[in-house]
A protein has these predicted regions:
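Helix-coil boundary/capping segments in enzymes
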Residues: 1-209
């Protein structure tokens, strides 16, 4: 299979937060202390289990750590290898799974600042989606307004399944914020896992999800 034409845009690149420690510099004192004192280990979701063969190409997995956590390797394998002009980072961290609205907001901010500093500042071909905490749409709207001034953030990221259908009025503040900042809303496969992902209950196999 030949490479795509030069100038292609990869609309779904998944940089991985290597560990919760990577986000500590981007949390305020309260949440940093909470993570340390409570021994919070990780906030990864189960959307892409590390041991699942289809979560990442075997040859892209490092010997230690997660696929997608290293910019140098990602640059070589996902950008240079395909002649990619731009790539949009969709960071699928566990922000949407948290029950505490304030904690979810703090981690959404941390993830966005981490992406900007550790990825966008270091690779001019990268763009990113704004990670929001839909648990509180007003918080999510505030985060959109905060990050939209950085034009390297090109859309708002939401998961296809949240606590309720995304068309509910509850989420309208998020859509208003996206609209006033001229940003599309990108809906990615995934779930907050509050409810079964099908109308007839939980699936048996990961592929069904």
């Amino acid at each position: 299979m030949s490479n795509p034409p030069v100038g292609a845009i990869d609309c779904d690149l998944h940089p991985a937060v290597p560990s919760i420690k990577a986000l500590l510099p981007y949390l305020d004192d309260h949440w940093r202390d909470m993570v340390i004192q409570r021994g919070v280990h990780e906030l990864d979701s189960i959307s892409y289990p590390e041991n699942a063969p289809i979560s990442a190409r075997p040859d892209w997995k490092p010997e230690v750590g997660k696929a997608g956590q290293d910019l140098v390797r990602l640059r070589k394998e996902a950008l240079d290898g395909f002649g990619t002009k731009f790539a949009i980072c969709n960071c699928l961290y566990g922000v949407q799974l948290l029950y505490t609205e304030d904690m979810a907001y703090a981690f959404a901010r941390a993830v966005n600042d981490w992406i900007a500093t550790e990825w966008l500042d270091k690779e001019p071909r990268l763009r990113a989606s704004i990670v929001v905490s839909p648990q509180n749409p007003d918080y999510a709207a505030a985060e959109i307004d905060r990050m939209a001034v950085d034009k390297r953030f090109v859309q708002v990221l939401m998961l296809v399944m949240d606590e309720m259908p995304l068309g509910r009025r509850r989420y309208w503040p998020i859509y208003r914020a996206a609209e006033r900042n001229g940003l599309p809303v990108g809906i990615h496969a995934g779930s907050a896992y509050r409810h079964p992902v099908t109308s007839v209950g939980w699936p048996t196999y990961y592929a069904e999800d």
